[in-house]
């Protein structure tokens, strides 16, 4: 949510920031609503003052036995009372209209975010690792000999439809090992607190984390009104909704491994083969709650936490800074980490690490008490994938594939796989 005071103070800067995202100016329409709302509030306050004055004079007239003045003042009190109610109702309606308009407007990009239209304008920050040099044409994950029988799309389609998969046997175990490895690394090495969170959330949690109203069509809602989370960013971030935190308690660093659900409403025809884009998938999420002056450093810390997972797995990747046209709705700045997929001969997103500034905090009224004793301020919230488990599985399988259809697995997973380090061409761990 945007700070209406900032828009009042510098509407040109607000419109310029929207223009960087390719949006039309909106300050004039917003401020017209704001002015009308404030006028109604002032009218209600003035009418209330007049009502209070008349109420006091009613008593005086009654005590003096002045019935004519008493009746006149009593009628005035009723008139002002009705006017107060009318003005307050009008102000409430205008406030709701203003809030609705603001809730559809994307976050303001940070100054260092590159301007651009789409992913072609993103800026590469760094690369890590050597791309594997195969003496054969590498296959996509679902075509690899040891994988094909354990990645069952047909049975999943029979039970659930398109964009679902049933992982079986050794591949299911590798998938589970990856999620455990990620959580253990974040808790034991990165100092995050593990949370086992709900995956069903209320409207307030979706709104507070900027998923409503913008992304209603991309999400699944149950018949009794709960929403299935598209990311555990939602329940993790919303843990501080309505709170006033002590500065000494910050930063708060959380992680969770959950199922996630997305309708992929805008992805028709994209990545239809394999398990790269699914309606149901698993992800390990990181969330940080910080003081404003710490959020930029915290974003870099979270980025390194995500990159470290890939480095421990030995998976080549590149990190890119997203341009204004490719950045998500709630983000002020986003870094994407893209893992190398030999089967596609391309880097594909495996993590996004974003800072939202106080955009989400304003929506959910999450604040902290500064150490100097000043008035409560809004916290900053950050989120990042650490990592998308299914996409990490794809990267492990494609980068480790061998000519005979087997897959050499990252050594760091051996402890989760009973000491086994290879997925055989027959689909067993050896």
UniProtKB/Swiss-Prot annotation:
What are the record keywords, sorted? Aminoacyl-tRNA synthetase, ATP-binding, Cytoplasm, Ligase, Nucleotide-binding, Protein biosynthesis
Designated name of the protein:
Serine--tRNA ligase
Q: Kindly list the GO molecular function terms attached to this UniProt entry.
A: ATP binding; serine-tRNA ligase activity
Q: Name one Pfam family in it.
A: Seryl_tRNA_N
Q: What is the lineage of its organism?
A: Bacteria, Pseudomonadati, Pseudomonadota, Alphaproteobacteria, Rhodobacterales
UniProt comment concerning the protein's domains = Consists of two distinct domains, a catalytic core and a N-terminal extension that is involved in tRNA binding.
The positions annotated for binding L-serine are: 231-233, 285, 385
This chain's source organism reads: Roseobacter denitrificans (strain ATCC 33942 / OCh 114) (Erythrobacter sp. (strain OCh 114))
InterPro entries xrefs: aa-tRNA-synt_IIb (IPR002314), aa-tRNA-synth_II (IPR006195), aa-tRNA-synth_II/BPL/LPL (IPR045864), Ser-tRNA-ligase_type_1 (IPR002317), Ser-tRNA-synth_1_N (IPR015866), SerRS_1_N_sf (IPR042103), SerRS_core (IPR033729), tRNA-bd_arm (IPR010978)
